[in-house]
């Protein structure tokens, strides 16, 4: 569950950076590239916050099942099929984590001044607390658990995620 959804469900006031961010995206054209698990909830939130949202995916509508219809009912425009990355007239693009950072289409978008970002990048920008990250092939869970226990023992309030 996204931090935004969690706080809204519980009536918790949002950090002013988050409020300002959502205010800034009103009326902006934002494309979500890849509409699987990660970008889908974010696209819905951005639409609710007044952005003009495009859900872009190399799959065809039939392959999306109910998801395509649900997005269209929310007022989200679908751009689907083999050429889904071509001629996107948008202000910002959110690429899915599985998408390579340096594709021809993304480089062309950057050259046009389009912001190419990801949900994690925006989270890191807006998160009001320090973030510690552990990467690698093996041992991440163990290492993360040990670090979190050290921080707890030092009296720090932590939120562990992965």
Regions found by a protein language model. Name each.
Residues 72-85:
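Glycine-rich, highly charged phosphate/nucleotide-binding loops
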Residues 1-13:
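Short, Lys/Arg-enriched N-terminal segments with co-localized hydrophobic residues
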Residues 29, 51-52, 157:
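Residues at the starts of beta-strands that form the adenosine-phosphate
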Residues 51-68:
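NAD(P)-binding Rossmann-fold cofactor-contacting core
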Residues 4, 48, 85-88, 97-162:
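Phosphate-binding loop of NTP-binding sites
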Residues 14-25, 83, 122-124:
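A short, basic/flexible loop-to-alpha-helix module at the beginning of a structural domain
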């Amino acid at each position: 569950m996204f931090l935004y959804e969690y706080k809204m469900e519980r009536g918790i006031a949002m950090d002013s950076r988050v409020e300002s961010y959502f205010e800034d995206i009103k009326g902006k054209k934002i494309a979500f590239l890849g509409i699987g698990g990660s970008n889908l909830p974010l696209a819905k939130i951005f639409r609710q916050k007044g952005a003009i949202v495009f859900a872009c995916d190399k799959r065809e509508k039939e392959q999306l099942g109910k998801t395509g219809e649900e997005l269209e009912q929310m007022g989200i425009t679908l751009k689907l099929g083999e050429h889904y990355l071509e001629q996107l007239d948008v202000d910002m693009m959110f690429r899915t984590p599985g998408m390579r950072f340096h594709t021809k289409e993304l480089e062309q978008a950057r050259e046009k001044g389009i912001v190419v970002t990801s949900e994690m990048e925006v989270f890191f920008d807006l998160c009001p607390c320090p973030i510690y990250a552990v990467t690698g092939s093996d041992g991440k869970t163990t290492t993360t658990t040990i670090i979190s226990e050290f921080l707890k023992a030092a009296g720090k309030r932590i939120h562990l995620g992965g």
